[in-house]
């Protein structure tokens, strides 16, 4: 069994050297991701496609491979195929017939062929021959070229016939690391998760910068969002998560800054700090989730004033998106439930925010800050490899337990993503198992029976520890981590 990875059309339009570089990078990215699923994964690059081979003795890996490929930037779509050899057009038909006889019975169908290589026939001739044979010697209703109930997809390359058994849509975009790195300001809300995802999809290695205004609980929640985005869409490359203790800045704003200017001043201080951190990391651009007119600090006038605080390029991929469109995208990429349970701190510090800030007035207000404030904040920022989040949780999860045995009043919650759970169901005889994906746990845990203890389970124990620590921070103490 194999997968044929089709490149995103924008890659195909590049010049030959750029196309080769992008294709080679995509091959490396696919290999990096799939090797974490199975060490025997085989990945081979061609000019206009990439082949992925599922080990013959491990057909169960096909679903896992397909799910991972669907989340790798730079892929238009993936087709899962079974491989056959052939000697003639009739030989092709004879091999297609037993595979599709039952599938097209009582239905309309058509045959579609893609062919590469030198043959004494063309694609249309194969379509007519195979289609005619299937129409004559099966119980199909007939051929319908437009909107058939079943499409028989075949690909021919040299003397090989590939029958397409499944088509998986890809992310599109460019392969990871074909663009320069960016530093994304992430709060854990709807907007910043989507803006981060869009730059991952565009091929930029996306690092995360979090301005902590709400203590440990807020940081844990944001780390879950960042880890989910990286693990799902950017796992092929290492990135950093930077946590900035921003409470001192907020304290000085509340104490010294005019009420109407607070929102704009806060954003300018964030941009200054992020720019300093980005420079240290060799990054040339900051990404934010700002959208025009969404809040008072995001008017054109205010955004212009905010941008004047630094020479660093500030990118706003959501600038013209409606809020509902952002939420819909948030739901699609799996960060909606995180965002719903995330506290919002930035909007409460100004009662009468200005929508037309004057640069001179804002700069005058900023002279009231302590001279070394940003220097101190930057020095206190903590940057970690995002892969270390699991290890960090191990050192902080002292308030909960990791168990291997299950007691009478304990319930196991399988928090894996639905596709993971379906691929490898958790079954424990005599034990109640609830299936709540990790991205829904924060919103659904409050509805569970408080008299019972819940054991969180995931494949590697990373997300279960994150979720346990987050729930403990919220005041729940009937939660443990289950590691059989």
From Swiss-Prot:
Family, similarity comment: Belongs to the ThiI family.
Pathway entry: Cofactor biosynthesis; thiamine diphosphate biosynthesis
SMART domains from the UniProt entry: THUMP
One of the record's GO cellular component terms: cytosol
This protein's record includes keyword Nucleotide-binding: yes
First-tier enzyme category under EC: transferase
Gene name tied to this protein: thiI
An individual GO BP term: thiamine biosynthetic process
Subcellular location: Cytoplasm
Function as written in the Swiss-Prot or TrEMBL entry: Catalyzes the ATP-dependent transfer of a sulfur to tRNA to produce 4-thiouridine in position 8 of tRNAs, which functions as a near-UV photosensor. Also catalyzes the transfer of sulfur to the sulfur carrier protein ThiS, forming ThiS-thiocarboxylate. This is a step in the synthesis of thiazole, in the thiamine biosynthesis pathway. The sulfur is donated as persulfide by IscS.
Top-rank lineage group of the source organism: Bacteria
Record protein name field: tRNA sulfurtransferase
Entry annotation: catalytic residues: 458 (cysteine persulfide intermediate)
EC number: 2.8.1.4
Family annotation (HAMAP family): ThiI
Residue pairs linked by disulfide bridges in the UniProt entry: 346-458
Binding-site residues, ATP: 185-186, 267, 289, 298
């Amino acid at each position: 069994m194999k997968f044929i990875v089709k490149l995103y059309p924008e890659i195909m339009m590049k010049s030959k050297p750029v196309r080769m570089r992008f294709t080679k990078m995509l091959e490396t990215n696919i290999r990096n991701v799939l090797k974490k699923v199975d060490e025997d994964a085989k990945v081979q690059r061609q000019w206009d496609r990439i082949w992925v081979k599922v080990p013959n003795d491990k057909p169960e890996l096909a679903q896992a491979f397909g799910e991972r490929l669907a989340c790798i930037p730079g892929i238009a779509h993936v087709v899962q195929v079974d491989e056959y050899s052939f000697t003639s057009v009739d030989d092709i038909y004879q091999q297609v017939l037993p595979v599709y006889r039952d599938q097209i019975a009582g239905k309309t169908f058509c045959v579609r062929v893609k062919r590469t290589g030198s043959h004494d026939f063309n694609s249309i001739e194969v379509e007519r021959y195979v289609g005619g044979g299937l129409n004559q010697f099966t119980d199909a209703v007939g051929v319908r070229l437009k909107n058939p109930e079943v499409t028989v997809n075949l690909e021919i390359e040299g003397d090989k016939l590939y029958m397409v058994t499944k088509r998986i849509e890809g992310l599109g975009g460019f392969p990871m690391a074909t663009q320069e790195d960016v530093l994304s300001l992430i709060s854990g809300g709807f907007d910043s998760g989507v803006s981060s995802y869009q730059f991952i999809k565009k091929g930029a290695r996306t690092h995360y910068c979090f301005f902590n205004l709400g203590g440990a609980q807020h940081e844990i929640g944001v780390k879950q969002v960042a880890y989910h985005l990286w693990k799902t869409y950017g796992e092929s490359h290492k990135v950093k998560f930077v946590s900035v203790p921003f409470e001192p800045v907020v304290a000085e704003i509340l104490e010294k800054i005019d009420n109407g200017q607070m929102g704009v001043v806060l954003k300018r201080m964030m941009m200054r700090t992020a720019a300093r951190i980005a420079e240290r990391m060799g990054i040339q651009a900051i990404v934010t989730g700002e959208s025009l007119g969404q809040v008072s600090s995001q008017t054109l006038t205010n955004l212009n004033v905010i941008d004047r605080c630094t020479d660093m390029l500030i990118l706003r991929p959501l600038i013209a998106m409606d809020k509902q469109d952002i939420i819909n995208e948030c739901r699609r990429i799996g960060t909606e439930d995180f965002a719903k349970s995330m506290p919002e701190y930035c909007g409460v510090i100004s009662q009468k925010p200005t929508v037309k800030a004057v640069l001179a007035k804002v700069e005058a207000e900023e002279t009231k800050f302590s001279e070394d404030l940003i220097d101190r904040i930057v020095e206190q920022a903590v940057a970690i490899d995002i892969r270390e989040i699991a290890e960090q949780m191990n050192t902080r999860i002292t308030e909960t337990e990791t168990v291997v045995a299950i007691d009478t009043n304990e319930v196991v919650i399988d928090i894996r993503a639905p596709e993971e759970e379906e691929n490898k169901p958790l079954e424990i005889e005599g034990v109640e198992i609830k299936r709540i994906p990790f991205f829904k746990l924060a919103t659904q845990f409050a509805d569970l029976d408080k008299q019972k203890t819940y054991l969180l389970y995931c494949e590697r124990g990373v997300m279960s520890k994150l979720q346990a620590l987050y729930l403990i921070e919220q005041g729940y103490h009937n939660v443990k981590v289950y590691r059989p």
